[in-house]
C-alpha cells in the first residue's frame, strides 16, 4: 500500500484524488467562503484561495447550504465572482452516477464547513493538494 502522508485522512484524500483524477469538495457558504461574522473574513479568504488552488488540480465543487431562493441565487453569483467554478448546488452534478445507498446525501471526499472542523479540514485539504501537485509535477518530469 502506498503511503503519501502519515495522516490517514490526508493519505486517503491523496489516494482518492490520484485514482479518480479529481476530488469532490462540498462546501457550506456562511463563514466558510462568504463571511457572515467579520472576524472570520480572513478564514473565508483562505478557504476561497484553497478551493481555487485545488481547482488547478481537478475538483468537482458542490455548494452544500441551507440557503434557498434569491439568497441562494445571489450567493452562487458571489461564489462564482470569487473565481470558483460551481458544479452543483445541494446535489450531485447531473453527469455523475450516484453510488448505491447514499439516499440523497451529497457525496464528497471532503466537506468544508465552519461548524464542522473547518481549520482541520482545510489543513488536510492543503496538504493533500500539495502532495498531488508535487506528484503530478514529478510524473510530468519523468515523462519528458
What positions do the PLM features span?
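HAD-like aspartate-dependent phosphatase fold
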Residues: 1-144
Amino acid at each position: 500500500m502506498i503511503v503519501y502522508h502519515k495522516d490517514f485522512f490526508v493519505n486517503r484524500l491523496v489516494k482518492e484524488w490520484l485514482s479518480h483524477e479529481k476530488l469532490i469538495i462540498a462546501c457550506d457558504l456562511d463563514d466558510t467562503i462568504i463571511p457572515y461574522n467579520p472576524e472570520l473574513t480572513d478564514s473565508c479568504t483562505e478557504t476561497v484561495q484553497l478551493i481555487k488552488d485545488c481547482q488547478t488540480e481537478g475538483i468537482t465543487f458542490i455548494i452544500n447550504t441551507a440557503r434557498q431562493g434569491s439568497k441562494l441565487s445571489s450567493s452562487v453569483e458571489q461564489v462564482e465572482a470569487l473565481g470558483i467554478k460551481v458544479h452543483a448546488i445541494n446535489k450531485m452534478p447531473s453527469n455523475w452516477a450516484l453510488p448505491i445507498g447514499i439516499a440523497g446525501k451529497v457525496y464528497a471526499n471532503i466537506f468544508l464547513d465552519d461548524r464542522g472542523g473547518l481549520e482541520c479540514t482545510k489543513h488536510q485539504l492543503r496538504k493533500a493538494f500539495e502532495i498531488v501537485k508535487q506528484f503530478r509535477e514529478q510524473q510530468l518530469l519523468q515523462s519528458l
